[in-house]
Amino acid sequence: GLGTLFMLISIHPTHPQPRQLSMVVDCLQSGGVIAYPTDTIYGLGCSIFKQDAIEKICAIKKVDPEKANLSFICADLSDLSLYAKSIDNSLFRILKKALPGPFTFILPASKEVPKILQSRKKTIGLRIPDNLIALSIIKTLGHPILSASFPGDEVEEYTDPELIQENWGKQIDMVIDGGIGGITPSTVVDCTTDHYEIIRQGAGVWDY
């Protein structure tokens, strides 16, 4: 960890400061685990290319990486299409309408997706949140970050960055304060078959 010195870092929600962003990116590049705001609830994140950090998040969640059905967030649609294989035109149009937004799309994983993140069915959850802090972190880092939920059901604990630091500060390296988060997770849509199926109804209203 980076010690408690850099633990809670405030980033402006509409004008993220480059200096803070580069501190977050340094943390991610050194294999750190962060808590960060999205367009829904706060997430646990790390670089998708740091296997130790992914394993650490799975340990916090008490899940086996193979069974965890992990997701990550991309900067934009061209980034997303690197990590998903076979997105046809009609699905692409839907993604274009729905994103950035509070959805997680389950798609067939391309070979660019690190093995540890692929489910047994070779799928991956992909997300482009409508949150400038999260998107700026990925753009500065240059590749996606994991998007994992905190364990447990006490949703209030995961909306307030200061409470997150109090509860989880010993297990994660940095908490990003981007203001109070939402309490409803993203809507999860399985797009691996012809009939798109809502697996979890969340903040995103599906009318496509």
Roles of regions detected by a PLM:
Residues 6-208:
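Active-site-adjacent structural elements in enzyme catalytic cores
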